From Swiss-Prot:
UniProt entry keywords in alphabetical sequence: Lipid transport, Secreted, Signal, Transport
GO cellular component, one term: extracellular region
Record protein name field: Phosphatidylglycerol/phosphatidylinositol transfer protein
Annotated propeptide span(s): 20-35
Protein purpose: Catalyzes the intermembrane transfer of phosphatidylglycerol and phosphatidylinositol.
Superkingdom to which the source organism belongs: Eukaryota
Provenance organism: Emericella nidulans (strain FGSC A4 / ATCC 38163 / CBS 112.46 / NRRL 194 / M139)
Example GO biological process: intracellular sterol transport
Record gene name: npc2
Length: 169
């Protein structure tokens, strides 16, 4: 199954869960998880968990236009650093929602999806820059979309985890 190119690019680029322990009225405390930290750059992305142990260190992701608009060309530029080589067998767990309705929940071969952004496995350790232009169809139904992508190596080590929330078309 092929994913939409913009979603694939966002997945690969492509988590800081902030916790606090407020005092409780009942005399005990509970951890509160705040929204994820934003990914640097002009984009709607957030990390979905603490990224310090991730294989992909994302330096920046820039989208133009941001937010993406139906019927336009989406320009993507991302820069980062891979701390390990990514080989065949890597995968992405993807969920796309339209409002509260889940449109897609799938586990896909990351290497097969990388061809949509002109990359291929293996991805070598070191700095990476991705630039891509994607024509977005004008027929994208109006509404709010959410994308969650959790990306792993073939050995189940986390590459990255990203959320794009409340994308309005």
């Amino acid at each position: 199954m092929k994913l939409l190119s913009p979603a694939t690019a966002l997945l690969f680029l492509a988590p800081l869960a902030v916790t606090a322990t407020p005092a409780s009225f009942f005399g005990y405390t509970q951890d509160v998880i705040a929204e994820g930290a934003p990914v640097r750059g002009d984009n709607p992305l957030e990390y979905c968990s603490e990224p310090s142990g991730d294989i992909l260190e994302i330096n920046s992701v820039d989208l133009a236009p941001n937010p993406p608009k139906a019927g336009t060309t989406l320009k993507i530029r991302a820069a980062g650093n891979l701390h390990e080589r990514i080989e065949a067998g890597a995968y992405v767990v993807l969920e796309v929602k339209y409002g509260l309705i889940t449109l897609l929940r799938d586990t896909a071969d990351l290497c097969a999806q990388l061809t949509n952004v002109d990359l291929q496995c293996p991805l070598e350790e070191g700095p990476m820059v991705l630039t891509k232009e994607v024509d977005l169809p004008s027929q994208i139904p109006r509404g709010r979309y959410t994308v969650h992508a959790d990306v792993y190596t073939k050995d189940n080590k986390r590459i990255t985890c990203l959320d794009a929330k409340n994308i309005q078309f």
